[in-house]
């Protein structure tokens, strides 16, 4: 399993974000509000979704894989593509997959849109402290996609605080990364917010009686330099994706592809949800409330 620990220079990132933070309370005033959703085109045949991101899209668990399995369990046809490179921002993900990306972006579909949905996840350093670059990267990639998918619905991935919930500045950086994601949504046509950060924050704060500590260990995220979603977090994210895109609660499969652990010899494989997830119902409710 690919578990290279990604070094973001996190101290410098947080220091920069701290210096650029506003003191306004407006950052978190819309935390509990339901965000507007983009309008997806009417697809002929199976719709197609593209995931663009780095290790928060796929590391210990895979958002594209879990979303595909949840769609299948709900008899929801879906073709899934992904452009994923660990530890880099959107423009570098594009550069890393340029040939594949250009080939796919040039494809057409009989309904007029090759892609129906696109999920865009920016790197934590950029999403947290470089709003201008964040907006420019999203504009660059959406402009390319819209050439043959003019009506595609875009979802901006709201990142998580890079700090542990126990850190005194966790909430400050949660607010900052959320504020920037909302700013990107506001400048991106036909886009909405995929509220991963909000959902994870709710789970940490015990919504629906969820308890993130299991045997005194964080059951949502794990990492040394970067905190990545574990099975509980991946389950939450998968349910959130379905609820956000289709505006309904998913029927969750009894088995999902989840991680066997966090060691170098661990991997992803199909597992019993009842055994691998600490509180599925609570996580499903948290996901639905953040759609």
Tell what function each PLM region has:
Residues 2-8:
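Sec-dependent signal peptide recognition
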Residues 48, 52, 58-136:
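Conserved SGNH/GDSL esterase-like catalytic core that processes O-acyl groups on lipids
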Residues 220-228, 232-291:
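Conserved catalytic region of serine esterases and O-acyltransferases that act on ester linkages
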Residues 14-17:
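C-terminal motif of bacterial Sec signal peptides marking the signal peptidase cleavage site
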Residues 26-48:
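N-terminal low-complexity, Pro/Thr/Ser-rich intrinsically disordered segments
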Residues 52-53, 157:
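Short hydrophobic segments within beta-strands
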Residues 106-231, 243:
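Alpha-helical cap/lid subdomain in secreted, periplasmic
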Residues 19-21:
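Bacterial signal peptide processing site
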């Amino acid at each position: 399993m690919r578990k290279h620990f990604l070094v973001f220079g996190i101290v410098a990132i947080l220091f920069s974000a701290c210096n650029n933070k506003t003191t306004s309370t407006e950052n978190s005033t819309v935390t509990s509000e339901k965000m507007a959703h983009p309008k997806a085109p009417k697809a002929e045949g199976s719709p197609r979704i593209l995931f663009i991101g780095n290790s928060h899209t796929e590391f210990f668990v895979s958002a594209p894989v879990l979303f595909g399995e949840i769609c299948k369990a709900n008899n929801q046809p879906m073709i899934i593509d992904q452009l994923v490179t660990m530890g880099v921002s959107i423009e570098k993900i594009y550069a890393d997959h340029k040939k594949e990306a250009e080939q796919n972006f040039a494809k057409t579909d009989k309904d007029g849109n090759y892609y129906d949905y696109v999920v865009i996840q920016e790197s934590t350093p950029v999403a947290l402290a470089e709003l201008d670059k964040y907006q420019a990267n999203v504009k660059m990639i959406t402009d390319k996609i819209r050439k043959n998918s003019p009506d595609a619905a875009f979802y901006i991935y709201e990142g998580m605080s890079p700090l542990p919930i126990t850190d005194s500045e966790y909430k400050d950086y949660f607010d900052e990364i959320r504020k920037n994601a909302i700013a990107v949504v506001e400048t991106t046509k036909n886009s909405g917010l995929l509220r991963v950060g909000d959902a994870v924050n709710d789970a940490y704060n015990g919504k629906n009686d969820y308890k993130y500590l299991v045997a005194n260990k964080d059951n949502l995220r794990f990492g040394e330099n970067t905190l990545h979603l574990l099975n509980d977090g991946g389950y939450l994210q998968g349910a959130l994706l379905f609820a956000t895109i289709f505006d309904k609660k998913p029927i969750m499969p009894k088995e999902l592809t989840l991680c066997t652990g966090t060691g170098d010899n661990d991997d992803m494989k199909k597992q019993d949800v009842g055994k691998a997830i600490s509180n599925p119902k609570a996580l499903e409710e948290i996901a639905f409330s953040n759609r």
